[in-house]
């Protein structure tokens, strides 16, 4: 049976955030709010927790997970970021974007896309997600909470509790959220490519390349 925390969506209670992070550190799988609906999260290094997430969502081998980072400095430890990519991300984070980048040696090989060695990276603006990442002190392995048979991210924490309370360790109630996914941008080449349109503005901005 999972725990169920009511955390204030704008001013997260430090006591509950600390308890949530301790669950993650001990190998737990949590449901938590992001800018684009609820997500499943666990420690990067915990293969067992990752496999539990795969079973919950019935994901195939090689599913592309995302690393949730607290800021660009942390993101740059886990992905190769050139000047063009840095300027674009600086102008659009934190926010509703997932960036595809080449992973560094800090990323476990099992998490990298097999052929291109890429990984999805996000810097969320949701206050609860940010508080979790700040307290954890490292990125969190994450994937949108889309249950089998659904094309939408789960948005109602009470419904999530009814369906998942026996298979996850913690569900964080952070309010009712939207169901649109993030906008996915491939930054592995010289020109950014939008791979998926989502809640992030399609006309994302980059700084003047001459800067």
For the regions a protein language model found, what residue spans apply to each?
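Active-site-adjacent structural elements in enzyme catalytic cores
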Residues: 1-211
């Amino acid at each position: 049976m999972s725990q169920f925390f009511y955390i204030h969506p704008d001013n997260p209670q430090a006591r509950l955030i600390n308890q949530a992070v301790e669950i993650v550190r001990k190998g737990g799988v949590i449901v938590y709010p992001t800018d684009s609906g609820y997500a499943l999260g666990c420690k990067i290094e915990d293969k067992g927790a990752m496999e539990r997430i795969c079973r919950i969502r019935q994901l195939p081998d090689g599913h592309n997970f995302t690393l949730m980072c607290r800021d660009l400095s942390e993101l740059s430890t886990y992905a190769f970021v050139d000047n063009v990519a840095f300027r674009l991300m600086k102008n659009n984070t934190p926010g509703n974007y997932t960036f595809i980048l080449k992973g560094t040696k800090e990323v476990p090989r099992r998490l990298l896309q097999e052929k291109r060695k890429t990984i999805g990276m996000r810097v969320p603006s949701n206050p609860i997600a940010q508080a979790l990442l700040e307290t954890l002190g490292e990125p969190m392995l994450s994937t949108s909470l889309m249950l089998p048979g659904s094309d939408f991210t789960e948005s109602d924490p009470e419904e999530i509790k009814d369906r998942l309370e026996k298979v996850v360790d913690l569900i964080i109630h952070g309010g009712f959220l939207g169901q649109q996914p993030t906008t996915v941008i491939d930054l592995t080449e010289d020109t950014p490519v939008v791979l998926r349109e989502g809640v992030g503005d399609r006309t994302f901005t980059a700084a003047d390349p001459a800067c």
